[in-house]
């Protein structure tokens, strides 16, 4: 039996398309959340003419996640010790003083206080 001739517009398709999963809709890829845009904004505030590679951005993102997890874990422990069920800015401030060394802790506390004040006045 001779093979059917292909229409002129469809010569040698590259890949056969697999049928879509049940439901007939295309699966959407889950978004990866990161601090990339915020790291980039801070970089441009500090050094407007400097760029950052994707590898360096990945390292910075890991660093921010690590510091966030350390602060959250220690603040949770502190609240538990004091029989509190809520982590407030006071716990976070105490933890920052514990985790960060000297001058860095002072700057972090002042920036945090400034951010909380700005937030409460904007409400």
Swiss-Prot record:
Chief subcellular location: nucleus
Entry's localization field: Nucleus; Chromosome
Keywords, in A-Z order: Chromosome, DNA-binding, Glycoprotein, Isopeptide bond, Nucleosome core, Nucleus, Ubl conjugation
Glycosylation site list: 110
Entry-linked SUPFAM superfamilies: Histone-fold
Comp. bias regions, Basic residues: 11-32
Residue ranges of the region described as Disordered: 1-33
Residue ranges, compositional bias (Low complexity): 1-10
GO CC term, one of those recorded: nucleus
Site of covalent link Glycyl lysine isopeptide (Lys-Gly) (interchain with G-Cter in ubiquitin): 118
Post-translational modifications: Monoubiquitination of Lys-118 gives a specific tag for epigenetic transcriptional activation and is also prerequisite for histone H3 'Lys-4' and 'Lys-79' methylation. GlcNAcylation at Ser-110 promotes monoubiquitination of Lys-118. It fluctuates in response to extracellular glucose, and associates with transcribed genes.
Cited Pfam families: Histone
Recorded GO MF terms: DNA binding; protein heterodimerization activity; structural constituent of chromatin
Record PANTHER family: HISTONE H2B
Protein's job: Core component of nucleosome. Nucleosomes wrap and compact DNA into chromatin, limiting DNA accessibility to the cellular machineries which require DNA as a template. Histones thereby play a central role in transcription regulation, DNA repair, DNA replication and chromosomal stability. DNA accessibility is regulated via a complex set of post-translational modifications of histones, also called histone code, and nucleosome remodeling.
The family this protein is said to belong to: Belongs to the histone H2B family.
Oligomeric form and interacting partners: The nucleosome is a histone octamer containing two molecules each of H2A, H2B, H3 and H4 assembled in one H3-H4 heterotetramer and two H2A-H2B heterodimers. The octamer wraps approximately 147 bp of DNA.
Protein name: Late histone H2B.L1
